[in-house]
Amino acid sequence: MAISTSLLIVALLIKLCLVNTAPPISKCFQDGILIAELKSSSGISEFCIKDDISILKSEITYSKNDTGIFMHSKVFRHWTVADWKQCNHTSAGGSTNVLEVDKNLNLVAKNYMCTRPCVITIDKENAQLLFQTEQLNQFEVTGTTISTGWFKSKTSVSLDNTCEHIKVTCGKKSLQFHACFKQHMSCVRFLHRSVLPGYMASSICQNIELIIIIILTLAIFIFMCIITRTYICYLMLPLFAPIAYLYGWLYNRSCKKCICCGLAYHPFTNCGSYCVCGSRFETSDRMRLHRESGLCQGFKSLRVARSLCKSKGSSLVISILTAMLILSFITPLEAMTTNYPDDKKFTLKEVNDIVLGRDMEQELKSSILILMSICGIGIILIFFGLTVLLEIVLELIAKRSTIFCKECNLIHDKKSMTYRGDFTNKCGFCPCGELEDPEGLVIHTTRKSCTYYIKIRNLKLIMLIFSIVILMQNATMLVVAGENCWTNTEIKADCVGPLIGPSACTNKGSKTYKTVAQELVTASKITQLDADKYVLLGDTIESALDAITSQKHYSAMHLLETMFLMKHCDYYKVYEHNSGYSQTKWRLIAIANSFDICTNTPTPNFCKCLSDSSCSTTTLNFATSMNATYTSKVEFFNHDFTLFLDIFEAAFPGSATAFLFKKIKEKNPYQAFEMMGKIANKYPNNKLLVVILKYGQYMVGLSHASTYQLKQEWVAKSLSLTRAQRTGLKMSMANAEPGPATKECSDAKTIACLTPKFQVEVNNLMSCGASPNFKIYVKTGELYKAHDRNSVWCLNDMHCLTPYTPANAEIITTMKKMDCWQDNPKQPTDEYAIPKRSCQMKDRGLCNSGADKWKIIKCDNHKLFYTDALERRDPASIVGSNHCFSEKCQIERYPINPTSLTNCEWLYRAVRPEYIKKLSLQTIEEYKKAIADKLTHTLQLYHFAPLLENLPHIKPTYKYITAQGTYTADGIEGASITTSIPALSGTSVGFKINAKDGTDLLDIVVYIKASVVKSIYNHIYDTGPTININSKHDELCTGQCPKKIPADPNWLTFSQERTSRWGCEEFGCLAINTGCVYGSCQDVIRTETKVYRKANEETVMLTVCITYPGHTFCTDVNAHEPKITDELELQFKTIDIKSLPNLVAVTNHKLYTGQINDLGTFGQMCGNVQKTNTSHTGAGTPKFDYTCYSASRKDIIIRRCYNNNYDSCRLLNQESDLLFDDNHETLVVYNNKRLNGELALKLLLGDIQYKLYTENMELELEAKCVGCVGCFESYQCNLQITSSLDETALYLVPVSHFHDRIQIKTTKKDYAMKISCTRDPGDKASFRVCGKSYDFNFHTVPKNDKIEVNVGDETSYIKEKDNRCGRWLCRVRDEGLSVIFEPLNNFFGNYLNMFLYILGGIILLFLALYILMPMCARLRDELKRNERLHQMEMKKR
């Protein structure tokens, strides 16, 4: 029995060993490549995640030693696209998402792009994008069409949207363009995806409007036929009754009667059996007798109306009219959304600025009406007063400073005048300088102008005195602090802010901190270095007060406070009253809080005065009502004294608060008693302020005040008693001088100097060389030891590429008056001091370093390194994308500061999209060669230079307009036309310009090429869905969780206590209902969406093209200022601008708007996880679970870290009307589909001598036309015309042309025009010009382009077609005529026209015989009857 038991135990042990040694089951995938591992006391969570090229997983094992439990974490990768490295990828940004692992095993999502060469072309006939490469590459199409994939040779992507706004990327090439089909493609896509082939779907959709109106007509007709079989049809009696009545009236009045039946004449039919009254007769004679005898009751219109209600013909007519009526009302609608700002809540610190701003706004609003009403009168009175008073004052001064000499009858100036008996030393001389003729022929007489010189001299004196008075007034502002306050080295009670504030404030708001600082420099109160500190005050009141209170020394605080009070001279002036913007903050604190002493019974008079401003401040009796309470209850004193200090700090920020805190900190609070008393005496009318200050005087006199402990933040605001010192050796700079230009510095020292009076620090200086002849430079960056010499220091990096900036003589002169210290520079330990052998390359290129060209690699962390092995990859890199800096990565190199390099030419700049290139060809032969070379084009646009693209695709509608100007015997001088045109892209209008006598002059086409509202947007962050969560966690066997859980920046922390229990604890932990699991986490997102913020206000830009025959030009005009040139004048008549959104999101090259978080805000909407550069930010409460194991650590499962509402980004509104140019970090967003107003234009035509023109003249004309039939470009024609006379030529062509008349000049030979052909004109076509026939040579390129490519801001053919013919009936008219007649016309040619003319003649003849003949016969009989009556009347006479 014992043996069997022993055998059983051995068997169980062997089985247990076999189980323990069995290979573990691998999660996610088997094997894989180990890419990173780490041993640490905190572990990561297990994950299995896939990116675009691989799958990653993590494995964690635990080990324990004497120091604790450690986690061994490993990360493995399994390739799904094994050969993706062949595309020569780089992390310059792209569409390939790759997850990498940093040194802490955190997942980092990066985007890579391939750099293999790729050729992008477009097949316009098949509407396909073509990609071609030699090795593995990746393409991506985003925008209205989305497609991506890998390929090795050729591939294509079909375009099927009506208008495509797409971004195409292949390899390192990226293009952005706009393309539109000839027709709307939504219908074609719908039908083509069914059983219909493509050409049939295109034909149906080309005539879809006609098909729809026919189907609707048939549907209505069938419905009408059904109701005609019921009595419901008589509901249409009100419709047909008026028609029947009108027909009956015309029947009786207008038609000749048949001699057989008495009814209306009917030449083509027999006499009927029914009379118009409804009676039936067997013979026509009885009917005639019935009509002639007067028994017929007349035409029964209701009978005819009832017949029409039952008639199928009338039903068909009603069906056609109803269908046309219904479809004529189908037009697009446009709406506008207005966003109203949400209410804003202000903090207590902002309240001063808000109240001041609102007070100023209210004051402005209340006084603007008064200012407007007295403005005109005031200006008149001022000028009148100056004129009158100045003249009077100058006249009085002139009389007092001059005398009239009776001896010489002249005026003399009293200045420097002496008497010589009855004469003076100035006799014979007049102040005006005019001399008498010695011969006595010209005698000078005294005039008023003789005193002008004296008046001007006195006027200069008055202006000088006035200027001095103004300067003295401004200078008095500088003395507000008293002379002793500027010389004090420590704060005193008389030199605090409320006591040194200016007593007068007459120029409120007229000064800036900069002007105030310069006034202090002028008054020799401070140096220029002190004055430059005004920038610390900022732009608002709170920023200035924060700058003042943050100073640690009295001199600096006094300086800034003086500047502040000189600018805001009324800050303490309003304390003379019981309200004001500067009192809002401390009064809010006093009202919102309560003193503990006020809870006692009876209530002290002090508490009553806090709520009643009419109480007397002489009956407060603090000692009587408060001593007992504060003596027994120290906590009451501490609370109330703290509240008093809060109020005092809000009321008197700056030096007054600093003085009080300083005395409390020194345990001498009673020394502040005098300061508070002086402040109370200065503002006796401010009752609440006086009460609080007297309360403060009482409180500082109590014994508890000496033991009161200031809060830490208040201790920091108390002034320091000692002057600042600097580390290093104090040195004399008496022999210092500016250093020479150099890039290297030996014996480098950093210099720190302090101004002797205000201790303004100057620490951006350094010296080179030995003592005492220091060479001084401005320290513009960090100092590094050269990487190859320890005694040499470099600027900004370790390569000595940046030159030092010598200090100027003014700075050195100032230094010699300061106390300066020298210290040895410290070698930084930042990224520029860390060498590397390789890195993940983001870009590469050549940069200028002085006169040399350096080969540079830009790493994924934006650091730049010199390299001489650009194509060498580091075999030890994880992803295989690290590039060596030297052969085989043997040499370590240091980063180069970007400021040391210039004119960098990067090879991978193509990650930023390029745009369509436009080429203007000067000759018709070049244009012919360009469009005929091949059908598959690169993305380039070719234009014939004389026409460019300044004409619309469709011939515009012409209007007649009369030229304005001066009409002469030869024609018009200064001819011009004035008109207006809607500011809408694609709008065009033609003008046939006539003279007043009706003479045709010339044709002009005005074309709005682009009318856009645009704005620039800056990229602020990326967002996307969460694909993984990085985490670090640890656990404690016993105890509580740490109060501060360690976490990296932007990581969220989580914790849970009482996690240890039986069966759920690590090995060796015997605990129940205690312990803790804690850690931190951060989301890893796939960046799918970029968010941009508007950087400037919207601008309206309009491009207007004017095309004369043979001359064309375009000009731009904005909405704010007119455009005036020698050829035209443009100005917006009306402006209607729709604001662009403030925030936009771009996903797959599509623009979205809606509820989007701004940078730094994390609301529950799109964009609450934000990636900026390499950091992720977000907010939320992590949710996590853990899995228990016996005698082992727990597995942490992070359910959620950040709140990521990326799903709401998919619900944003796509802005199909907004287009944009993607410039990587910026967007140019524009709307070219909106009517932006009305543009008034005046075209200046110059002189037109049309009366000298002749009708018929001989021309030497040679014409060549190149183009295609029915394509976007039409035919471009070049005309070579030689004429001996100026002429306006009328040309007649057998095709559609954009101009009927051209103006021929003797000085010009080349002309250009555009014509459209619906069929091939052949090699030659006959044109008539000036009455003569000429042959035009044509070259037709066989093209069937389905798609038109442009840059997006210009209008396309389909948009111009929609603008021209946007309603259903217009489309039906065009499509119906083209469907019926175009195939016949192509087959029969001119014979079809002959047939149509004959058919039209037959129809007119039929109408004449059937309708006009009876009416004419009736008219003839009526005329004969009147003739017979006239003859009978004549016989009776």
Swiss-Prot record:
Q: What does this protein do?
A: Glycoprotein C and Glycoprotein N interact with each other and are present at the surface of the virion. They are able to attach the virion to a cell receptor and to promote fusion of membranes after endocytosis of the virion.
Q: Which GO terms describe its cellular component?
A: host cell endoplasmic reticulum membrane; host cell Golgi membrane; membrane; virion membrane
Q: Specify the domain of life of the species encoding this protein.
A: Viruses
> Its gene?
GP
Side Cytoplasmic, residues: 229-312, 395-460, 1413-1437
Binding partners and assembly: Glycoprotein C and Glycoprotein N interact with each other.
User: What ranges does the Lumenal topological domain annotation cover?
Assistant: 22-207, 334-373, 482-1391
The biological processes this protein is annotated with in GO are: fusion of virus membrane with host endosome membrane; symbiont entry into host cell; symbiont-mediated perturbation of host process; virion attachment to host cell
Q: Where is this site: Cleavage?
A: 481-482
Q: Write the signal peptide boundaries.
A: 1-21
The PTM entry states:
Specific enzymatic cleavages in vivo yield mature proteins including nonstructural protein NSm, Glycoprotein C, and Glycoprotein N.
Q: Which family does it belong to?
A: Belongs to the orthobunyavirus envelope glycoprotein family.
Could you tell me which cysteines form disulfide bridges?
Answer: none
Q: Which residues are glycosylated?
A: 65, 88, 627, 1173
The source organism is: Bunyavirus germiston
Keyword field: Fusion of virus membrane with host endosomal membrane, Fusion of virus membrane with host membrane, Glycoprotein, Host endoplasmic reticulum, Host Golgi apparatus, Host membrane, Host-virus interaction, Membrane, Signal, Transmembrane, Transmembrane helix, Viral attachment to host cell, Viral penetration into host cytoplasm, Virion, Virus entry into host cell
InterPro entries cross-referenced by the UniProt entry? Bunya_G1 (IPR005167), Bunya_G2 (IPR005168), Bunya_nonstruc_pro_NSm (IPR026400), M_poly_OrthobunV (IPR014413)
Q: Where are the transmembrane segments?
A: 208-228, 313-333, 374-394, 461-481, 1392-1412
Name by which UniProt lists this protein: Envelopment polyprotein
